[in-house]
Amino acid sequence: MTPPKTPAFQPLTGLYEPSAIQQLPDGRFLVVEDEKSHPLSLLTISADGRVDHTALTPGWLQLFSDFWALDDLEGLALDRAGFVYAVTSHSRDDDGDEKKSRERLVRFRIDGGRVMDSRVVDGLKSALAARHPVLAAAARIRDVKAGGGLNIEALEMSPDQNRLLIGFRSPLHDGRALVGSVENPSGIFESNEAP
């Protein structure tokens, strides 16, 4: 008897606008979405192709934490120590306004179905703008999509695990995407250093 074929493509029910996905050491997948009400989800894909989805939500003591005030998540990275890093777009909203919830870099762990050891860093946008005139000019653009305003799209840990690499959707430089780096990820989360 031939085993049933697992479809190559399946709908991911419960996910609406995924922006990034990161496989965790235990085989599950962490997905971030551009959804304020449920920005983080865990997916498990079983051997038979079944997909189980669990939205990560704050515990009672985390309800008012800045960590859960994340809007427009775009990138995920994982380090060897098991910390997950996530970044929001740092872009202005559709009205051209700046919002703290869109300008966050966070670090946390996943323990079972819970977020643990969460930390939030604000000030990445101002640090990038202070060091790079192209990014400073882009940060002033109110119409991000049409005008090439500052917009982070991706995050990755460097191969040596010492830096966080940030991929920008915009601005472009000579028609090419920019990649920036945070040189001190441990320091900003553990010692309150500036990015």
Regions found by a protein language model. Name each.
Residues M1-P195:
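Sequence/structural signature of beta-propeller domains
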